[in-house]
Amino acid sequence: MLALALLALALSSCNLARMHGRAVERRLVRHGYTAHTYQADGPHFVWYRNTGKPPLLLLHGYTGTGALQWHKTTALLSKEFDCILPDLLSHGRSAKWDSTRSGLSLDDQAAHIITLLDSLGVRAAVPVVGNSYGGGVAARLAELHPERIERLIIYDGLVSDYSTALADSIARAHGAPSMLAVMRTPTANDLRFGIRLSLYKDPPLPGFLLKQVYREFAAPYRASQITLLKDLMAHESTFVHKRYDWRVPVYLIWGERDELIPNATGRAILERHALPETHWVTIPRTGHVANIERPKAFVAVLRSFLTASPIEP
């Protein structure tokens, strides 16, 4: 529910969802970023700039886009990194070609990212940060292509130790029958469930604004996006207990009050992979999207992990 949470914070009663999306893209352009679409088996879309600074790969969460999730992070890191902001398959401008395609997996997403990196000419290993579903993509990318990843930073990520039973219990606590029902969001009013789960504080949202967000950022993509979650559910027995073969340094960032993917899940990932305690940080007064709720606090933690001398796995 990332894009929905972001828009809930960013839009006021006099704004339109489409206007906000365009404003975000204009800010990226002002910082020197350009949009790239590569036609392989369909459009693979990414924002990127190349000023000679180290590249940093940022992967958005479920329902998000690279621009919507990461524009604040990109601005705060503008003097240090040239960020790579892809739209994952079934999201944003990487979704136009596959609106009816189903069964996309984390491996498909990882291949999509490699296609983009190759197309941009980024061959050296880069640090990758992945939030929520994007955390799962980043985790699999680092496992499949360790030669392309310098370090892995999982941020409130859907990586392992998260079962359908746990997800459904969280959904029921917020008045929904199941997590799949929350993510399916067949009506604009259903977006409220996802927003409550994503944010530390619930913003007051008028119905007309929910309808705008739904029409612009949810309805066109939901049929394809829901297949991403169904793929994870189909492989739940492996996914929940998976111990990744990571050969790069791994760090974890979590929102202190993340109700969507709780801290306990992050701690379980830390312990399952025997990661150092110093590679785990929680950000106070944040939920599932700390980089949106407290962007400066998030970047301070991220910067410390990006510049740290890691304890090798």
What residue spans do the PLM features occupy?
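Active-site loop/oxyanion-hole signature of alpha/beta-hydrolase fold enzymes
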Residues: 85-129
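Alpha/beta-hydrolase fold catalytic core
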Residues: 1-56, 80-81, 307-313
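Short alpha-helix in the alpha/beta-hydrolase fold that links the catalytic acid
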Residues: 248, 262-271
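Short beta-strand/loop motif that positions the catalytic acidic residue
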Residues: 246, 252-254, 258
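Conserved alpha/beta-hydrolase catalytic His-Asp/Glu region
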Residues: 164-166, 184-244
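Catalytic active-site module of serine/aspartate enzymes centered on a nucleophile-bearing elbow/loop
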Residues: 276-313
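Conserved HGGG/HGGXW glycine-rich cap/lid loop of the alpha/beta-hydrolase fold
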Residues: 50-96
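Flexible "cap/lid" loop of the alpha/beta hydrolase fold
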Residues: 143, 151-186
